[in-house]
């Protein structure tokens, strides 16, 4: 799996993975890669095994963001998705937004929201009695995630800079590393923006959320938004864009949303600032409690069990091959 950038690896020899599957002999398979491992669906079909594609990204919006253009992307992604629907028995998505690219293709779609660790990410990570905002009146904002344009960290930063320009007392704390970090550091000079780098401990990540008054998770092409749930679980309300999977997680009781531009996010943040307090933090936690890993895992196991029951598993093809060779030698 060679690196194709500082952030990502790609499986270059997928047939080696299929060889491992032959030894493992699964009753169903689940694939999370739309590029290099889709041939696993053909492998499964030849053996009478059910196949699930877990779609973690919306390719049309993601590629349009990378290429900085929409023209030609929808047609290419549409062709790929039609092929995926034919290859896999089931497509799993995490949100209504992420299901959109499979609309009208005849896919067997299942929406399975992800979950959050409600014990690690907990309001108790915030010092007891700490007001929101704190005594100095500064509104503490945070962004937790990769400093890479597909996550739109620069939008969160620019919204904080816009709030500062409007005269609001804010402090933006950015946690994470990535290819856009240096450019963002240079752009935010002179503004109340602090970059803390990579945070290794999940406990420290939870503390970063809990110590903040508002978490900014504003990517409009996020198919779900684990960072949203982690912040909410810590009792921290969230500002997000008014489209995308993260938008589906943040309701009126737990945060706010705005147009995905610095002014729109700043407006949403300003409206949320006026609602800060213990009640909002309690509502944020209650919203996160609706999403558990136990429920996600249970739903996925049901999908796999259903596939195993309804797809008549053919005899294992290598066993047949061995039997045929033995019969030939006996002759």
Which residues fall in each region the model found?
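Carbohydrate-associated surface elements
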Residues: 97, 115
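Conserved acidic donor-binding segment of nucleotide-sugar-dependent glycosyltransferases
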Residues: 251-263, 270-277
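Conserved donor-binding/catalytic core segment of Leloir-type glycosyltransferases
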Residues: 131-161, 173
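Short hydrophobic beta-strand element within catalytic cores of glycosyltransferases
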Residues: 237-240
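Short alpha-helical donor nucleotide-sugar binding micro-motif in glycosyltransferases
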Residues: 21, 85, 198, 207-212
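Aromatic "clamp/platform" in nucleotide-sugar-dependent glycosyltransferases that forms part
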Residues: 220
């Amino acid at each position: 799996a060679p690196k194709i950038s500082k952030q990502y690896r790609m499986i270059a020899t997928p047939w080696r993975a299929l060889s491992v599957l032959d030894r493992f002999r699964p009753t169903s398979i689940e694939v999370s890669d739309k590029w290099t491992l889709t041939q696993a669906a053909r492998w499964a079909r030849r053996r009478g095994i059910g196949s699930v594609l877990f779609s973690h990204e919306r390719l049309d919006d993601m590629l349009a963001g990378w290429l900085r253009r929409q023209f030609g992307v929808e047609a290419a992604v549409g062709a790929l998705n039609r092929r995926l629907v034919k290859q896999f028995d089931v497509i799993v998505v995490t949100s209504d937004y992420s299901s959109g690219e499979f609309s009208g293709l005849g896919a067997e779609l299942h929406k399975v929201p992800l979950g959050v660790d409600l014990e690690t990410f907990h309001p108790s990570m915030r010092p007891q009695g700490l007001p929101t905002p704190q005594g100095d009146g500064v509104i503490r904002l945070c962004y937790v995630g990769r400093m890479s344009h597909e996550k739109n960290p620069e939008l969160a930063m620019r919204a904080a800079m816009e709030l500062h320009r409007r005269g609001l007392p804010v402090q933006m704390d950015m946690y994470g590393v990535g290819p856009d970090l240096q450019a963002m550091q240079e752009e935010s000079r002179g503004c109340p923006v602090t970059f803390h780098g990579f945070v290794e401990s999940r406990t420290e990540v939870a503390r970063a959320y809990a110590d903040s008054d508002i978490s900014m998770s504003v990517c409009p092409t996020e198919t779900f938004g684990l960072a949203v749930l982690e912040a909410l679980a810590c009792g921290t309300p969230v500002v997000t864009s008014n489209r995308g999977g993260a938008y589906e997680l943040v309701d009126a009781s737990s945060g706010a949303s705005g147009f995905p531009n610095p002014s729109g996010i700043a407006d949403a943040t300003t409206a949320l600032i006026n609602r800060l307090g213990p009640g909002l933090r309690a509502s944020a936690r209650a919203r996160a409690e609706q999403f558990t890993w136990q429920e996600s895992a249970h739903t996925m196991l049901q999908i796999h069990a259903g596939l195993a029951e309804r797809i008549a598993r053919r005899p294992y093809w290598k066993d047949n091959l061995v039997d045929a060779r033995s019969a030939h030698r006996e002759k």
